[in-house]
């Protein structure tokens, strides 16, 4: 299992253990799960059945726990193995047609009050902040994914209906999160690529352990990046200094060969001799070796005079 999948699974395992205290929040979390995982089956006028499928055992247990708490409907649990990916199991919770199924579908916005299928009908409970958090948690458990912070910052939630995607975007926005949307095959994906926004989302849905882990990795990563930037800057400065020193040595040797050093002032002759004696030293260090010592700017001024004199010989 990759780092990204294991982190996403860790987040979902943590969220799957949470049980909202308020009945309205339990209803909205179940609504989010039904919305994300549910497949509506219509077998005649007003006869609905519902199947929820997931490859996460903790999520399937969360579905069952919320069903028991929210609705008295009968359900069947099936565990199947994918044909193409034999290692993966699929957990299916099938709710056959019965009294209460329509209420679940209406709760998730799949049908309107008249029982007609709809792309999205917003439950009135979503006017409450705590219920929106619960709905987002259920939706993420069903169709969300988050990358591990070690490599990249990416969190996404997948949905199918444009109206539902817009509603999710508004819920996230009201929670302080600006998600972007992209079409992917037959789905719409809301995604976040900023670390601060992902951390905010994890806190919003209640994944506090995952949030701390994400923050810890991010801080370590930023510290490493800062150290790397400092090292790169120092290496660049050292390279620049070495190149400049090499040019200075070459210029002074030309002056020496032409006998021009004998005609310069003693301070310039002193600095030229120090540069030849200490080719790796910085101008600041050369200035400190002068007698009397001079500042870095003073040493640089003298060196510019020597370089200009060498250029005049060409």
From Swiss-Prot:
GO biological process terms held by the UniProt record: cell division; regulation of sporulation
SUPFAM superfamilies the record matches: Homing endonucleases
InterPro entries, per the entry: Homing_endonucl, Intein_endonuc_central, Sporu_reg_WhiA_N_dom, Sporulation_regulator_WhiA, Sporulation_regulator_WhiA_C, WhiA_LAGLIDADG_dom
Keywords attached to this entry: Cell cycle, Cell division, DNA-binding
One GO MF term attached to the UniProt entry: endonuclease activity
Keyword DNA-binding: yes
DNA-binding region boundaries: 282-314
Family: Belongs to the WhiA family.
Biological function: Involved in cell division and chromosome segregation.
Protein name: Probable cell division protein WhiA
């Amino acid at each position: 299992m990759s780092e990204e999948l294991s982190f996403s699974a860790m987040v979902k395992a943590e969220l799957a253990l949470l049980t909202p205290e308020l009945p309205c929040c339990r209803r909205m979390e179940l609504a989010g799960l039904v919305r994300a995982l549910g497949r509506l089956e219509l077998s005649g006028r007003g006869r609905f059945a519902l199947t929820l499928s997931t490859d996460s055992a903790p999520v399937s247990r969360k579905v069952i726990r919320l069903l028991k708490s929210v609705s008295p409907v009968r359900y069947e649990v099936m565990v199947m193995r994918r044909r193409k990916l034999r290692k993966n199991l699929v957990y299916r919770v099938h709710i056959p047609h019965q009294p209460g199924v329509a209420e679940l579908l209406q709760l998730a916005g799949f049908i309107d009050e008249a029982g007609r299928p709809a792309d999205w009908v917003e439950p009135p409970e979503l006017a409450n902040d705590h219920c929106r958090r619960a709905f987002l948690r259920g939706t993420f458990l069903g169709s969300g994914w988050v990358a591990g912070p070690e490599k990249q910052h990416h969190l996404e939630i997948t949905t199918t209906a444009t109206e539902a995607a817009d509603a999710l975007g508004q819920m996230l926005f009201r929670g302080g999160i600006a998600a972007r949307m992209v079409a992917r095959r037959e789905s719409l994906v809301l995604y976040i690529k900023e670390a601060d926004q992902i951390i905010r989302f994890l806190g919003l849905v209640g994944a506090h352990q995952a949030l701390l882990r994400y923050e810890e990795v991010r801080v370590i990563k930023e510290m490493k990046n800062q150290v790397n930037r400092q090292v790169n800057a120092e290496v660049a400065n050292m390279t620049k200094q070495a190149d400049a020193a090499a040019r200075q040595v070459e210029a002074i040797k030309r002056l020496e060969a032409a006998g021009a050093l004998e005609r310069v002032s003693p301070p310039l002759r002193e600095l030229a001799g120090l540069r030849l004696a200490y080719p790796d030293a910085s101008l600041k260090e050369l200035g400190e070796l002068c007698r009397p010592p001079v500042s870095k700017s003073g040493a640089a001024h003298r060196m510019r005079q020597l370089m200009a004199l060498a250029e005049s010989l060409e």
